[in-house]
Amino acid sequence: MQKQNWLITGVSTGLGRAFAEAALTAGHTVVGTVRSEEDLRAFEELRPGNAHGRLLDVTDDDAVPGVVAEVEQSVGPLDVVVANAGYGLEGTFEETPLAEVRRQFEVNVFGAVATLRAALPHMRRRRRGHLMAVTSMGGLMAVPGMSAYCGSKFALEGILEALGKEVAQFGIHVTAIEPGSFAPTGPDGP
């Protein structure tokens, strides 16, 4: 396999960290986004020279395009972008405050959209690339007590399906990653 440049959001723990470790092990260069200096240093220590950390809050609409453009300049053309940053919100529909529902969509939907949109023009110009986003089995079937989370993942599924049809003509692939349950890493898991 040819060495590729990857950008993965949310690599501090969990799936993002696992994706990054797998790509690094395969010999790829990975730029991983985190929200703290401590997590940035820990990520870069995984594979010095191939693991590059960037501070980014995916809900900062102004910051996302700048980070993607900077990575394209400093690391090289991005071959794969994985919009992974997200979280699960538990709570019944009736009892979950609207502000928490909005935040769930800001991170899980609009953060992913901002990330993929920022990378798309670069890939379209090169007529190649792979855009991925982590949805969930919760984006395919509803789970009681997680209406906001499932709603955000259903929304992302629809966006990705349409996006795939829009960009296929440019040689760009789109993948929805739909994991089921997994054991978290970091402070909340093994």
Task: Identify the role of each PLM range.
Residues T92-F93, E100-R102:
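Substrate-binding pocket helix/loop in short-chain dehydrogenase/reductase
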Residues S12-T13:
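Conserved glycine-rich cofactor-binding loop
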Residues L56-G66, L98:
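The beta1-alpha1 cofactor-binding region of Rossmann-like NAD(H)/NADP(H)-dependent oxidoreductases
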Residues S136:
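Residue(s) in the substrate-gating loop at a strand-loop-helix junction
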Residues A168-P190:
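SDR active-site lid
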Residues L116, S152:
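Active-site helix of classical SDR
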Residues E94, M141-S147:
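Active-site loop immediately N-terminal to the catalytic Tyr-X3-Lys motif
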